[in-house]
Amino acid sequence: VAAAIACALFNLKCKIYMGYKDIKRQSPNVFRMKLMGAEVISVENGSGTLKDACNEALRDWSRNYQKSHYMIGTAAGPHPYPTIVKEFQKMIGEEAKKQILEQENRLPDAIIACVGGGSNAIGIFSDFIDEKVNLIGVEPAGKGIETGKHGAPLTHGRTGIYFGMKSHLMQSQEGQIEKSWSVSAGLDFPSVGPEHSWLNSINRAKYVSVTDIEALEAFQILSKK
């Protein structure tokens, strides 16, 4: 949606790739993007989710790089894209830090954020990495880790090369990328931004996973509070 807004503001053509499953799951956002003049292309390949949309967008850009610009909303992919996304998303951490200091006059004990590709999480983590604050990332365990239908590369994957980056990813013993799963379209991704992989390797951040059911139950509890 942000890309569609920016392109509408500057009168630029906007072509957005989305997996066909995500188009169904995020139909209100698709409507908003089309309303602003964006062309939304349904990706039928593979699992029809974020991973496949990213691949198709990169293929398009590689064919038309002289007259187009590639944009991605997650902190993953080849350099410098993870850094670009972090630099824009870090306002989340800056604002959170400012507000808690104003209200509590101290830093929080912990920062907890969901992790798919990891853009929102790295955004809020960024201003606390050098502070004595626990950083906790929560990956989607989907239907359960034991079922294989999850999206938890940091807690149940291993290091590899994917999407132009070295990071943790879900892969078979033969090194083939496995399908991810999450009730949330934004978390349905088989890898994670490389900075999260690094924070995990140096034990600066702790990463855990929760199932779809657990996440929805937590959402209901929070909504009632």
UniProtKB/Swiss-Prot annotation:
Its EC number is 4.2.1.20. Keywords: Amino-acid biosynthesis, Aromatic amino acid biosynthesis, Lyase, Pyridoxal phosphate, Tryptophan biosynthesis. Belongs to the TrpB family. Pathway: Amino-acid biosynthesis; L-tryptophan biosynthesis; L-tryptophan from chorismate: step 5/5. GO terms for cellular component: cytoplasm. InterPro entries: Trp_synth_beta/beta-like, TrpB-like_PALP, TrpB-like_PALP_sf. It comes from Buchnera aphidicola subsp. Rhopalosiphum padi. This is Tryptophan synthase beta chain. Tetramer of two alpha and two beta chains. The beta subunit is responsible for the synthesis of L-tryptophan from indole and L-serine. It holds the Pfam family PALP. It is an enzyme of class 4 (lyase). Disulfide bonds: none annotated. The gene is trpB.
